[in-house]
Design a protein with these regions (language model features):
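Catalytic Walker B motif of ABC-type/P-loop ATPase nucleotide-binding domains
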Residues: 18-22, 27
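C-terminal coupling/interaction segments
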Residues: 106-146
Length: 146
């Protein structure tokens, strides 16, 4: 409720830009959904700048993503373009125990009803390739920089 009131106060002066810092952190699922619906309704009328670490918020609310690294802008593009950074690098493997190549574990995933481990690997693998997400692209992008 406080966040909705804060947004309402910010909109009183009919601004061109609305800055939001971690706006959904700590919200329960229902309030988070309500908040996202408010943002969707107003984002056509003004520029909404959203600072968040919650990737699902970015995917559902943002048209473009700006990535900061050490205080510098390192990327500014669409969600799809950031996801494409990981294209051909995201795989579903049965086990990571025998992998000789470095990889980044992204957790469990189910493909065609079978459980796998989702990984990101710079080296091509003989495993089912997965469609990359914005989070996968972000991980690949950041690892390129470091």
């Amino acid at each position: 409720m406080k966040r909705r009131l804060g947004i309402a106060q910010a909109l009183i002066g009919d601004p061109d830009v609305l800055l939001l810092d971690e706006p959904t952190a700590g919200l329960d699922p229902e309030e988070r959904l309500n908040f996202k619906n408010v943002i969707r309704r107003i984002k056509g009328d003004l520029c909404v700048v959203l600072s968040t670490h919650i990737i699902t918020d970015i995917e559902s609310l943002c048209d473009r993503i700006l990535v900061l690294c050490d205080g510098r802008i390192t990327a500014f593009d669409s969600c799809g373009a950031l996801a494409d950074v990981a294209r051909g690098k995201v795989y579903a493997v049965e086990s990571t125990a025998d992998l000789a190549t470095p990889f980044h574990s992204m957790g469990p995933v189910t493909v065609d009803g079978k459980a796998y481990e989702k990984i990101i690997s710079k080296a091509p693998l003989n495993a089912p390739a997965l469609e990359p997400t914005v989070e996968d692209g972000y991980i690949c992008f950041i690892e390129k920089l470091s």
